[in-house]
Amino acid sequence: MKAWGALWIVLGLLLWPEPGAASSLPLLMDSIIQALAELEQKVPVTEASITASAWILSAKNSSTHNSLHQRLLLKAPSHNTTEPDPHSLSPELQALISEVAQHDVQNGREYGVVLAPDGSTVAVKPLLFGLEAGLQAHSVANLPSDCLAIPCDTGDTLANIRATWPGLMDAFPNASSPDVGATLPNDKAKTPTTVDRLLAITLAGDLGLTFLHRSQTWSPPGLGTEGCWDQLTAPRVFTLLDPQASRLTMAFLNGALDGALLGNHLSQIPRPHPPLSHLLREYYGAGVNGDPVFRSNFRRQNGAALTSAPTLAQQVWEALVLLQKLEPEHLQLQNISQEQLAQVATLATKEFTEAFLGCPAIHPRCRWGAAPYRGHPTPLRLPLGFLYVHHTYVPAPPCTTFQSCAADMRSMQRFHQDVRKWDDIGYSFVVGSDGYLYQGRGWHWVGAHTRGYNSRGFGVAFVGNYTGSLPNEAALNTVRDALPSCAIRAGLLRPDYKLLGHRQLVLTHCPGNALFNLLRTWPHFTEVEN
């Protein structure tokens, strides 16, 4: 029960932050884990969650999703319980939790986020809500009974799937019929009466509301905006790369997905649950229970396996309907039909699954500590028609952690700039064996990777020497499938692009015999004479 008690105290502080001095602790996931570990030592092995719930339910919260959270997450208080005292925590810990209490985006800065060991930035609030939903071990909550009567229940019969979900079959052409039939309303369906608690609390509600707002203002939602920390060793300030970003930043999506994945894990394992500090240390480290795939580096791949697009669309719709019924005064949701909410849910899910889950995670230049570009970059004329594959050769060993990959990036940039006298690192992108891509010159600047052809294609390099061995499967899948499909969708790469190895155009052994022989079996590979 320690996991419950510690998390309820943290959630209480999240929902009821008190003003005070800024924490001296760096905004690192390790600091959050440290905070949970300290709380776990203070919480007795009792039904502490019931005690804390009374306190949390009485808290004042300015969040627009307060009613959704209370309906799906918080239990009714017991009159026989006493409130936990947050002041028993150290002042430094109180200050840290208050600092990450609410996720927000203001004036180009993002609040309530921390830097994880894998180099990703994570919003704390949706992560902790997902953990709590998982600890409760109930995935489905009923709509409130008073909202099943007039005026909450409109009584509108949704004639068929196409009427309920305009464009859904076109939006998800690869969804199997059984999946669609299992998750979408049938021809007699009415107002949804259940909602997935994990996804509604961590992701679906925010996803739907953000796209609803942007559809009303005719503005794209700016899904997954990245940002830069003021420093990486002891980060304090996170500035977004797009000052017009929506709340669905990369950090928020990371936190929401982590919360859903870990909450799902907690709901399926037997009790007693492991200490949450231990679970987070594994997830943001080598992997939960030693599984190297079940960790934050591969959240997108694991998230894609957690739910299908039609299922997520259904859950986004149900979250919006529930919020509409719980908050009839909500301006965004007034005079909006369920069919319109279904359209928003379809659009939001399509964008999330294709532009986030379906795309590789790319660390921006600031994340690996890039030196400034020397001179003035030449813009590419997009879309390009070629993808050129390299291996770095030196560094020879694959990089398997953010720290080692970032160090390799800085080393290659120094060599390219100081020894070869290039303006910048030559590659467009570099592929680590840690589950991440690293931005070099990126999508818009001409690189220095394939002499004579730099303006015609993107240069992508695997870290390592692949003369006699291959990169890991995750890295290969990224370059073969995720990266080009995402670039095509964004209009950066032509659908009929050609894939070539470096050696086909320049006198070199790059990208190594083993890797090149594999490339020859890939789609879009083209034989040319050097």
Curated annotation (Swiss-Prot):
The record marks Y427 as: Important for catalytic activity. Disulfide bonds join C399-C405. It is found in: Secreted; Membrane. Glycans are attached at N61, N80, N174, N335, N465. It catalyses: Hydrolyzes the link between N-acetylmuramoyl residues and L-amino acid residues in certain cell-wall glycopeptides. One of its GO terms (cellular component) is membrane. Coiled coil: none annotated. InterPro entries: Amidase/PGRP_sf (IPR036505), Amidase_domain (IPR002502), PGRP (IPR015510), PGRP_domain_met/bac (IPR006619). Its main location: secreted. Strongly expressed in liver and fetal liver. This is N-acetylmuramoyl-L-alanine amidase. It comes from Mus musculus.
